[in-house]
Amino acid sequence: MSAMPNTSSISVSAAFDAHRPLTLTYIDNPSTKHVIVGMSGGVDSSVSAVLLQQAGFVVEGLFMKNWEEDDGTEYCTAMDDLADAQAVCDKIGIKLHTANFAMEYWDRVFEHFLAEYKAGRTPNPDILCNKEIKFKAFLDYALTLGADYIATGHYTRRSVNYKNNDGIEVAQLLRGLDNNKDQSYFLHAVGGDKLAKTLFPVGELEKPVVRQIAEEHDLITANKKDSTGICFIGERRFKDFLQQYLPAQKGDIVTDDGINIGTHDGLMYYTLGQRGGIGIGGVKDRPEEPWFVLAKDLDNNRLIVGQGHEHPMMLSNELHAYKLDWTDGLPPTDIFSLEGLRCMAKSRYRQPDQACRVFAVNADGSEVRVIFDEPQRAVTPGQSAVFYIEEVCLGGGVIASIDAPCGF
């Protein structure tokens, strides 16, 4: 594939005209290209396999088991998902491999997940799962099977390949065409070198079209419900699951003006901006308005709450992020300038784009300071700040801290 300019060596705005989306028809001689599809047992990966097969690629599937426990009957179990994946592969006539990455998942994802909750933060394990398992362990395994590419059912796109300033062949991550389903937020930590070996067949489609294709091919997954929630929890109650691994310590619920009004079940069960499930009824001499989580006082094990959807303690103008992953492999040079990098950001999934400036706070651009044009509500440490310019996802990092106009 042709070389492309990258945002590390030229102005960011000038580079993006060259970031052409990669489509399946762009790849030469597909009949000589071996693609292994991550088959989850869902409709998106099923249709991805169909589209690749129709485009002429040599296609096989691989089902990943990332979690050993499978003791529930109220949610779709791994065995059910495997059966559906096998049924789809049988239907379209491709081989299905299986691989167990449970040990890798525990070491690289789950232990980090527990450590973050123990530290009072709210992590997003799906982002780390994509980085460490789906686009690392799976990719590495697929390459041993002779794959030229892997493919997944994510609603995102990527550019054609180009070489960055270090001479490494990479691709840029692009938003999916379906704005309601775009998953680039969850894939921002996947390196461009991994993206260069990945195909996203449904990234050019909207969800209703994907289901229509599945129905036309009489796939068992055509009307299967989309999976929701953290992958290893399934449909189980989050609190019940977390209690198996982290002992909860009850503490006081305190208002923003210092009044004790209740008892919380453990700070790890709450997140900033949360409204429901706090366990506060009517409070004497207070208006009948909803209560929101404003802060966690870790030193004193107190949950700070207040009333008002736009309470000042929930608003912040700046955040500090660390563990930055830049898709290109190199940070945009603009973050080292006095003016910073002008771009859009999301501090949570599905949040509308927020205008901001990004400044490096260390020499390699792995930590940044983000200043928003407008105050942001309920920015949560442990979640990710992800940066965009138009359709291009530049990368992102973990939110370490925020500033707030008011403190407790």
UniProtKB/Swiss-Prot annotation:
Q: What class of enzyme is it?
A: transferase
Spell out the CDD domains in the cross-references: MnmA_TRMU-like
Task: Detail which positions bind ATP.
Answer: 38-45, 64, 153
Q: Name one Pfam family in it.
A: tRNA_Me_trans_M
Q: Which InterPro entries does this UniProt record tie to the protein? A: MnmA-like, MnmA-like_C, MnmA-like_central, MnmA-like_central_sf, Rossmann-like_a/b/a_fold
**Listed NCBIfam families:** PRK00143.1, trmU
Q: Which HAMAP family match?
A: tRNA_thiouridyl_MnmA
GO terms for molecular function, please?
A: ATP binding; tRNA binding; tRNA-uridine 2-sulfurtransferase activity
Instruction: Report the function annotation for this chain.
Output: Catalyzes the 2-thiolation of uridine at the wobble position (U34) of tRNA, leading to the formation of s(2)U34.
Which cysteine pairs are covalently linked by disulfides here?
129-231
The name this protein carries in UniProt is: tRNA-specific 2-thiouridylase MnmA
Could you tell me the keywords of this UniProt record? ATP-binding, Cytoplasm, Disulfide bond, Nucleotide-binding, RNA-binding, Transferase, tRNA processing, tRNA-binding
State the similarity comment: Belongs to the MnmA/TRMU family.
